[in-house]
Swiss-Prot record:
The keyword rRNA-binding does not apply. Belongs to the HAP2/GCS1 family. Fusexin 1 subfamily. Gene3D superfamilies: Immunoglobulins (2.60.40.10). Disulfide bonds join C125-C155, C389-C432, C457-C477, C490-C506. Residues 91-170 are annotated as: Domain II N-terminus. Its main location: other. It comes from the Archaea. Exhibits fusogenic activity. Mediates cell-cell fusion in mammalian cells when present in both cells (bilateral fusion). It comes from Uncultured archaeon. Residues 1-19 form the signal peptide. GO terms for molecular function: metal ion binding. This is Fusexin 1. Ca(2+) binds at D112, S146, Y149, D150.
Length: 631
């Protein structure tokens, strides 16, 4: 079964209302592959012109089946529910911001010199303008107890740190939505999506499925104002942080560093205010107001919750209405016969309808074929191969894949090699197993092969060799021509003597009577005639003599014939054969005659030597009679 991929493409546009998306606007089917799955593709496009708090799409199996050449076996539902949207506001501390503290008045006298008073202000007093020199007043007075002038100082010291201020950064959108996909009654595939999972170009896992985003999933609500508030950190605050009024902090900062607090030191020094009046009623009023929590009339951020309570990474989260603005996105769902969405398509069914065998010569290759018909209802991709062959046969080409339409046939061809494995039979019969596999079914059969072994000898021919005891043994070629079989071992005083035509016999011989190691027939042109082999066999000598005689006779005719032909070509005239009174032989060249004689002898001897002596005698008599009558 060909696999397919189901692509669900949703195009959702931002709007103002919050209607639930429930249907698809168009369904198209494209044959091909998707980015994540092999196979065909469903594209289901949905367009919604509003932000929404829910997507609930239902597609029936019949609706999907209409768009493909197969059958979809389950309904499909896609839901985006349980949306939760927030804004995250991070905090940033800065050297531009000063801690909010309460102050206490500080007075000391008895300094001997002016410089002693200045040094005491630098070391012991709170630095109002943060320039590193301290802030305070000093004056000279006459000491009654000692008749000298001493110095006194008036300043503030830090009493308690109320809070550390920090800027509130612009918000990051944080939202989640639970996505669920289910085909029929199969296990639900789900994922919880957030803005980190739904950015432009991001691919999100939805169980075994995928969601590819073509834009950013955004909040469907406005952001609360953050420019009129400031974050305040203190261990005394619940969860460490609170939202303060930025203007109250600026008023405190201006009062402390802008000169108002220093003016109170002057008023205290000249007696306008007492120390307790300055400390309890005047200098700490702005500090206490600066650390108060902002009101809801200033910003909706007062309803934000602390997300991170640490000083360095503090942050707030603000819940927004549960609306999301969806971009276009695509859901990829594995489909096919074994996919999450089951799609059944007509498939091919292979059936082997014929095979052809082959004969293979030893060391060569032959070709076997098998014809396969697709008896299924759909196109099939069939993989044909030779899986195994019998002993002595080896597979050269083992696999081939072909696409076959319904009702069509295709032929597979494979080369098979053969090498000799037996000395018992000239022909080796065997078989190879041919298999063809489709997606859902397969077929197999045996294809016969025959190996033809090369002949090692001519049946009936003999050869001889000495054994380990230095005695002659005679071997005879078997009827199948594949091997020599042991015949006989000659006696110690015998030798294996050639008898002609590759035959041998054990004969008693003198030490110098031949019978060497030659494994052939020992029937040379003159050795057989004059006993060079020491055989003394009369029949062999007669056979050789008649062969020579035949060669001489043929040489005679070759000599005369060659001179006659040469003489004929030398005659002048209109029609040469009319000059019967001219001797062509005498006119011909002797050199041509010699050449003809040699050729005639070789041909005559060669032809005669292959016949039995009886046949040779009959032929010689026939030639003699012919010479007598036609000379």
């Amino acid at each position: 079964m060909r696999r397919a991929a189901l692509i669900l493409a949703f195009v959702l546009f931002i709007g103002l209302s919050s209607a639930t998306v429930t249907s698809a606007d168009s369904i198209t089917y494209n044959s091909g592959t998707s980015e994540f799955f092999d196979g065909d593709v469903f594209a289901i496009e949905v367009t919604a012109d509003q932000s929404t708090d829910e997507i609930d799409i239902y597609l029936g199996a019949s609706e999907l089946s209409e768009k493909t050449d197969g059958e979809v076996n389950q309904d499909l539902s896609i839901e985006f529910t349980h949306q939760d949207s927030k804004l995250k506001y991070s905090t940033s501390t800065s050297d531009e911001l000063r801690d909010i503290v309460t102050l206490t008045t500080y007075y000391e006298d008895g300094f001997d010199t002016e410089q002693d008073a200045i040094d005491a202000i630098k070391s012991d007093c709170y630095d109002l303008n943060q320039n590193g020199n301290g802030s305070g007043r000093y004056s000279r007075y006459y000491s009654v107890t000692s008749p000298v002038y001493d110095y006194e100082i008036y300043c503030f010291q830090k009493n308690e740190k109320l809070a550390t201020p920090a800027y509130i950064d612009n918000p990051d959108e944080i939202f989640t939505a639970k996505a669920e996909l289910q085909a029929g009654d199969k296990t639900i595939q789900s994922a919880t999506l957030s803005n980190g999972d739904a950015g432009d170009g991001t691919v999100t896992d939805l169980g075994d499925s995928k969601i590819s985003w073509n834009g950013n999933l955004d909040l469907g609500a406005s952001e609360p104002e953050n420019s009129r508030v400031i974050a305040l950190y203190s261990n005394d605050f619940e969860n460490g942080w609170r939202i303060g009024n930025k203007q109250s902090y600026e008023d405190y900062k201006t009062f402390i560093g802008g000169g108002d607090a220093y003016d109170l030191l002057i008023d205290w020094q000249d007696g306008t205010y007492t120390a307790s009046e300055v400390e309890d009623e005047l200098v700490n009023t702005d500090a206490n107001q600066a650390v108060e929590e902002a009101s809801s009339s200033t910003t909706d951020l007062v309803n934000a919750k602390v997300k991170d309570s640490s000083l360095d990474t503090g942050s707030f989260v603000y819940d927004t209405p549960e609306l999301l603005s969806y971009p276009s996105f695509t859901v990829y769902v594995d489909a096919g016969e074994n996919g999450y969405i089951e799609v059944t398509k007509p498939t091919g069914d292979p059936d082997i309808i014929s095979t052809s065998s082959t004969e293979i010569k030893e060391g060569d290759e032959g070709t076997v074929t098998a014809t396969v018909e697709n008896v299924g209802d759909g196109e099939g991709e069939f993989s044909g191969r030779l899986s195994s062959c019998g002993e002595g046969f080896s597979i050269v080409d083992d696999q081939n894949t072909k696409n076959v339409g319904a009702g069509e046939s295709v032929t597979y061809s494979f080369d098979v090699a053969f090498s000799s494995v037996s000395s018992e039979s000239k022909e080796i019969s065997g078989s190879c197993t041919f298999e063809v596999n489709g997606v859902e079914s397969s077929d197999s059969t045996s294809v016969s092969v025959t190996g033809i072994q090369q002949s090692e000898c001519n049946p009936g021919d003999q050869r001889r060799e000495k054994n380990e005891n230095d005695r002659w043994e005679i071997y005879t070629c078997q009827d199948n021509g594949l091997t020599y079989e042991y015949d006989v071992t000659c006696a110690e005083d015998e030798k294996a003597v050639a008898q002609g035509d590759n035959q041998f016999s054990c004969e008693k011989q003198d030490d110098d009577s031949g019978g060497g190691d030659n494994t052939g027939s020992d029937s040379g042109l003159f050795s057989n005639l004059f006993g060079g082999s020491g055989s003394g066999d009369l029949l062999t000598q007669v056979h050789t003599a008649l062969s020579i005689l035949a060669g001489l006779v043929a040489g005679f005719f070759g000599y005369r014939g060659a001179r006659w032909i040469h003489g004929e070509t030398d005659i002048k005239g209109g029609f040469k054969l009319e000059s019967r009174n001219v001797s062509r032989v005498k006119r011909g060249s002797p050199v041509a005659g010699i050449v003809g004689a040699v050729l005639g002898f070789v041909v005559g001897y060669g032809v005669a030597s292959v016949f039995h002596p009886v046949v040779q005698i009959i032929v010689v008599l026939g030639i003699a009679v012919g010479l007598y009558y036609f000379r």
